[in-house]
Amino acid sequence: TRIITDPIRFGKKSKISALFDELEPEMAKLDLRRDGDGDEPIVLTKILRLRQEIELLKVPDLADMVEEAREAGNAVAVFLNFTDSIDALSRRLKENHSFVQGGQSKDARDNAVSDFQSGKVGIVLCNIAAGGVGVSLHDTTGNAPRVALISPTYNAKDFHQTLGRVDRIGGKSETIQRILVAEESIETKIVKSMMTK
């Protein structure tokens, strides 16, 4: 398995950078407010909203990455944090794909995974909260090397669980996992910290 964390210059870099400029002080506030002064929910809500906007701005480039990986003969698993991003990416993709996301029945989830594993679809879009645990998306035949495109989550446990979805014992081909880190952003530091945990 190769895990690539090199920062990416996204097409909407200036908008993404502006949002990170808003995000960074909010994260610092959260660290300072661990004393329980009651403002944590407000700060957390703002951080969540900013992260959602940032992830959505990455979608056009992400769609291109998915298409490039498919053209190279890879099966692609995309892990995102927000439903809006999954929906936006789904609208941009020309190829059929399956979904693993919250609110699905066990049967629907199992069918989505089965369609991906069997090669019926070459792309699966996963919500990290729903597809990060208990889902095996590794290459079991050797016919479709896996590429995972992973939006950074700020939770180390979720991050490591997500890395384990396409890289499993018994995998028949090399896996490439690309963490979608925006260049010159706090994401670089966050992902570096999680990689060492």
Task: Annotate each PLM feature.
Residues E95-N96, V121, T140-V147, G171-Q177:
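Short glycine-/polar-rich loops that comprise or flank the Walker A/P-loop
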Residues S85-L89, V133-S136, D158, K189:
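Phosphate- and divalent-cation-binding pockets in alpha/beta enzyme and binding domains
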